[in-house]
């Protein structure tokens, strides 16, 4: 990982009020106070990466004020917004633009990972909420993030994977 390649992301995080430290092969981000609202426009490289948009959307859902995200690269990238709303986020989507009105905190909820990026965003949102959230359809997450549960636990996250018996199989038993 080269921190220089993350410049569009780290610049936005700094603008949101975070402290960002760059090392040779790593970046450390710390919250230093209130999260400030942002305007984000996704762009092809070297602009703000569309793959980071759902994760930034989670951050903006608890920013102090109104943020806008314009998705210029992919259609349907805002599929995660319905899941954030289940957690109490205030987000309105009109075409390729999402407007986030920051709330004080997110609440736990049953969630769904509709794709890889949305799944990562739901994991972060669930970790931000006080209480237990369950995320279904985690295959997307596991495909894109090897050993995510163990890695997040290593960072201090209270996270676990629960194996469920499919309802149809459970009824047959």
Task: Describe the function of each predicted region.
Residues 1-173:
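Short, structured segments at the rim of ligand-binding sites
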């Amino acid at each position: 990982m080269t921190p220089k390649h993350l410049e569009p992301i780290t610049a936005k995080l700094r603008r949101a009020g975070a402290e960002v430290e760059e090392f040779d092969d790593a970046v450390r981000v710390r919250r230093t106070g209130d999260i400030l609202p942002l305007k984000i426009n996704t762009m092809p490289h070297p602009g703000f990466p569309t793959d980071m948009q759902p994760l930034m959307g989670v951050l903006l859902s608890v920013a102090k004020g109104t943020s806008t995200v314009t998705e210029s690269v992919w259609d349907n990238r805002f599929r995660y917004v319905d899941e954030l709303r289940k957690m109490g986020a205030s987000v309105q989507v009109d075409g390729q633009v999402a407007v986030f009105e920051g709330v004080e905190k997110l609440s736990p909820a049953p969630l769904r990972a509709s794709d890889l990026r949305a799944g990562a965003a739901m994991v972060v949102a669930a970790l931000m909420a006080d209480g237990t959230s369950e995320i279904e359809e985690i295959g997307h997450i596991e495909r894109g993030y090897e050993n995510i549960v163990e890695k997040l636990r290593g960072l201090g996250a209270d996270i676990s994977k629960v194996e469920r018996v499919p309802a149809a199989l459970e009824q047959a038993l």
